[in-house]
């Protein structure tokens, strides 16, 4: 449809960089246009509010309150780099692989699109800071699980995105995540709060989803089974529903 209906886009460099998406069957991360803008903008500009993107593309100088052509031009250039990083196949494959390696192997196990969006932002920023691959993947997994368990991006996601990315800009991605995660998930969370949160019949509970992910990551067997894993059970159930 795009090839026939949007000749201008097909002729742009963006189409060539993202046409691989047509062959993707993985629905773990199925971003919208807004998700792409949010990740590209936040990771590249160090800001989390999309209204700031509109202002910057208009040439807004936040210090002088004036509008300058040079700022508009630089902002479009910067956004372009962010979008190209977002649609880079290697980057996209890596973030979905990280989610799967954390145990989140099905899309219905992920209740927060913004938790994935910020995980992708962390990944892109970590790459820019030259964080070693193994350390970066571990950090993104831990942050994503923390975001799911605490509902970090469920209330006012833009404000939280903005606060988090500014702290990352100031302190560096590893230092910031290493300080936040134990603060958000202290021992008392695991021993006191989480058992209470798990007392629910809802299978869409983020706590239950994270419990399933932990079982998958640890290779746990199904109840009263020697051979069938939790992974097998969940994948089989997903196949039946499809």
Indicate residue ranges for each PLM-predicted region:
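Active-site-proximal structural scaffolding
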Residues: 7, 88, 92, 112-115, ...
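Solvent-exposed functional surfaces
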Residues: 1-188
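Intrinsically disordered, low-complexity N-proximal targeting/linker segments that flank membranes
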Residues: 148-241
């Amino acid at each position: 449809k795009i090839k026939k209906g949007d000749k201008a886009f097909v002729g742009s460099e963006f189409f060539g960089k993202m046409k691989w998406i047509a062959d993707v069957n993985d629905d773990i991360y199925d971003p919208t246009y807004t998700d792409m803008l949010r990740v590209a903008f936040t990771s590249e500009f160090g800001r989390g509010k999309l209204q700031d993107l509109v202002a910057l593309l208009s040439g807004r100088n936040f210090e002088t309150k004036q509008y300058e052509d040079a700022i508009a031009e630089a902002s479009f250039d910067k956004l372009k780099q962010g979008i190209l990083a977002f649609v880079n196949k290697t980057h996209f494959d890596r973030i979905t692989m990280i989610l799967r390696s954390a145990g989140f192997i099905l899309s219905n196990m992920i209740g927060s699109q913004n938790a994935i969006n910020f995980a992708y932002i962390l990944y892109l920023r970590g790459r820019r800071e030259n964080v070693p691959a193994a350390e970066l993947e571990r950090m993104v997994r831990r942050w994503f699980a923390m975001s799911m368990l605490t509902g970090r991006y469920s209330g006012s996601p833009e404000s939280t995105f903005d606060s988090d990315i500014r702290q990352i800009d100031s302190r560096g991605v590893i230092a910031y995540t290493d300080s936040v995660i134990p603060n958000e998930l202290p021992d008392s969370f695991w021993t006191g709060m989480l058992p209470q949160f798990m007392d629910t019949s809802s299978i869409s509970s983020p706590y239950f989803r994270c419990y399933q992910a932990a079982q998958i990551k640890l290779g746990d067997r199904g109840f009263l089974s020697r051979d069938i894993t939790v992974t097998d059970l969940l994948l089989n159930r997903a196949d039946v529903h499809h």
